[in-house]
Amino acid sequence: MGRNKSKYYKRTLHQQAYDKLQGMIAFGESKTNAKKNGTTGNKIYSKSTYQTYKKHINYFVKYIMKTHPEVKSMKKAKKYVAEWLELRVAEGCSAWTINLEAAALNKFYEIAPDNPKRFQCPRRNRVDIKRSRGQKEQDKHFSKLTNEELIHFCQACGFRRNVLERLRGDDLYDRQRVEQCLLQARKEHDMSMIKACEDALHFFSDQEYFILHRKDKGGKTRLAPIIGPYKESVIHRMKNTTPDALVWNYVNSNCDMHGYRADYATYLYKLYARPIELLDYKKKILCADGKLRSEIYVCRSDEKGKKLDRKAIRAVSVALGHNREDTAITSYIRNL
């Protein structure tokens, strides 16, 4: 036992962290089923989540090595998690960054939400968001005139970069194809495609064309409607791209994808929002989490008192690939 323990501590903290993270990988497994079984605590289901958590855990490891060189195991480093996160708050990191780093360490150390020692992160307020707000340094290196078609394409479809860079001509779906795809997915028990098709047909019953967002954030697949004044030019480009060819061979790295997703979300909300005066606060609708809530969403924080159509918010969330309605409101829907 002593020799094995000695051998363990010869590994650096980085090696110990890497080994632990490798053991948590569950790529390709169903997170939905794991949630039902209550076994998601020590698993990471997405490659992008793994890479993000790995990066932020390495920041923590570097801090431990610098400030607590006597610590030789990740197990003993656990007691410094709160100290590290408090330092990050003092350094002026955004609430989003703090929440992300806390999520990474909570997952790594399996710190449950009801654990009294779990770090209490600062609230994330819409007014504090800096991403895609105002002029940024990268905007100086991006010509809106030269990239006009790319911008319009993004505003009509709400892409994340990873999906746009992999988009093929075959990813255009008309309503008939969605219906056929749903039948095929049911035969093959392809649950992700079944949900994508059912959501498209249910939430966007008046739309004719959709883009397949294949294996987006979290490995999710969805069909989002093509909307807005540039809809026809998007459909034309898709139809004139051969099925296996990339629609865009190059996507400028300075393109503000998040900002154009916000344009898409805002346009979509306005398209589906009903006049608030026609809605009834007492009328309940079923939300994504299975709970019944008023069809009127009342904003908080800096927009306290503003009322929005919860049904339209739900449609926007589905199109963006988010489950939580507050994400659509806080990060995307603007200037209403």
Regions found by a protein language model. Give the residues of each.
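Intrinsically disordered, low-complexity domain-flanking/linker segments in eukaryotic proteins
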Residues: 180-195, 280-303
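Short functional hotspots where side chains directly engage DNA or cofactors
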Residues: 179-180, 210-213, 291-336
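DNA breakage-rejoining catalytic core of tyrosine-based enzymes
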Residues: 119-145, 218-229, 242-243
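N-terminal core-binding DNA-recognition domain of tyrosine recombinases/integrases
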Residues: 2-3, 26-125
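Basic, Lys/Arg- and aromatic-enriched nucleic-acid-binding interface segment
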Residues: 134-167, 299-300, 307-313
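Short, basic/aromatic-rich helical patch in the C-terminal catalytic core of site-specific tyrosine
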Residues: 164, 258-273, 316-317
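C-terminal catalytic core of Y-nucleophile DNA break-rejoin enzymes
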Residues: 215-236, 244-264
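Short, charged phosphate-coordinating catalytic segments
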Residues: 154-204
